[in-house]
UniProtKB/Swiss-Prot annotation:
Part of the 30S ribosomal subunit. This is Small ribosomal subunit protein uS14c. One of its GO terms (molecular function) is rRNA binding. SUPFAM superfamilies: Glucocorticoid receptor-like (DNA-binding domain) (SSF57716). Signal peptide: none annotated. HAMAP family: Ribosomal_uS14_1 (MF_00537). The lineage of its organism: Eukaryota, Sar, Rhizaria, Cercozoa, Chlorarachniophyceae. It comes from Bigelowiella natans. Binds 16S rRNA, required for the assembly of 30S particles. It holds the Pfam family Ribosomal_S14.
Length: 100
């Protein structure tokens, strides 16, 4: 199980990304289509003023059962350990153990 502080930090990041997403996209589009260098530099300074944790790249995929960040399978939303456990217990429909 992941530490509670890490999970809370991740929730905080998700909220910040959701809150500043439209403003960040608008600034990026303005920078992309700006004509002068001075206008571009002013827009970039505005973009830098936004919180760092409001960037989507800062989010981390985590297992929804254990909260582990490593060994994450996107299709299931689980870490590798929980995927194996739940697969053996037949808790994931359509998942079968491979044998050849």
């Amino acid at each position: 199980m992941a530490k509670k502080g890490m999970l809370e930090r991740e929730k905080k990041r998700q909220n910040l990304v959701y809150k500043y997403n439209s403003r960040r996209q608008a600034l990026k589009n303005s920078i992309k289509y700006s004509s002068s260098f001075s206008e571009t530099s002013l827009l970039k300074k505005e973009l830098e003023k936004l919180p760092l944790n409001s960037m989507k790249i800062r989010l981390r995929n985590r297992c929804f059962v254990t909260g582990k960040p490593r060994g994450f399978y996107r299709n299931f939303g689980l870490s590798r350990n929980m995927l194996r456990y739940m697969g053996h217990e037949c808790l994931i429909p359509g998942l079968m153990k491979a044998s050849w």
